[in-house]
Amino acid sequence: MGSTQSVSGTPARPLPRNKHVSRVADPRSPSAGIQRTPIQVESSPQPNPPAEQLNSLKQAQDPDPRSPTLGIARTPMKISGPDSQCPLVKELSEVFETEVSETEVSESISSPVLGLPQETPLSSELDLPPDPDPQVSLEDQLLPWSQTELNSKQVFAKEEAKQSTETMVSGQTSDKPSRDPETPQSSGSKRSRRKTNNKVLGRSPLTILQDDNSPGTLTLRQGKRPSALSENVKDLKEGVILGTGRFLKAGGGAWEQNEDHDKENQHFALMES
């Protein structure tokens, strides 16, 4: 068989060499010859910036305590200088201060003149006699109010008593026979109604509970109506049958319907076949 180590007979071909791909670390990249990314682009030589620009950049990159991310100055810093106020604001503030000072001076001048009439009421108050007893005066003022309240309460109680007596008398004297006996009432009213019905009608209390719709009582709607057949049977029993097919009632009643037809037939001769 063969040996353990196999050696190729043909020499290996060298890798293809491309001048664009020679600078790329990984030649398997699809964009090997296209310089797109900053990694692939060679750094161009840049001139050194002056020292003034470096200082300005450092000042701009100073951490802003108001920024949520330190090292990034996003909001502009407020310039706080000695002359930050507008000249118009200064003028207005000065005018306002002068007006306030003038008003204070005028008030201080007018205060001694106005002091005399303020003291005059004090002398008039001293002339008035003091109240002898403040508690007694308060009680005197409260007495008429309490008396009026008591009078109103008494009148209200009397009116309520009158209304209650009137309702009791009207409930005892008034009788309502048209009211349905099954309607709910108090026990006293039920007993009084049953007693009066027993005396007047002479029936037992159970008969009061029977209405028109109860099965125990017969009304005109529930009664039996006489039928035509029953009337004919009665007529046959009471009447006398004649030979011509018509009958006359025993009491000499009226002729039946067949009578008219028989009268018409009497004018013509009977045909015998």
From Swiss-Prot:
Residues 94-105 have a biased composition (Acidic residues). One of its GO terms (cellular component) is cytosol. Coiled coil: none annotated. The modification Phosphoserine is found at residues 29, 31, 44, 67, 93, 204, 214. Pathway: Protein modification; protein ubiquitination. The modification Phosphothreonine is found at residues 37, 75, 207, 217. Its main location: cytoplasm. Keywords: Cell cycle, Cell division, Cytoplasm, Mitosis, Phosphoprotein, Ubl conjugation, Ubl conjugation pathway. Residues 1-231, 251-273 are annotated as: Disordered. Ubiquitinated and degraded by the APC/C-Cdh1 complex. GO terms for biological process: cell division; protein ubiquitination. The keyword Ubl conjugation applies. Residues 90-124 are annotated as: F-box-like. F-box-like protein which is required for entry into mitosis. Acts by participating in E3 ligase complexes that mediate the ubiquitination and degradation of WEE1 kinase at G2/M phase. Interacts with SKP1. Part of a SCF (SKP1-cullin-F-box) protein ligase complex. This is Cell division cycle-associated protein 3. It comes from Rattus norvegicus (Rat).
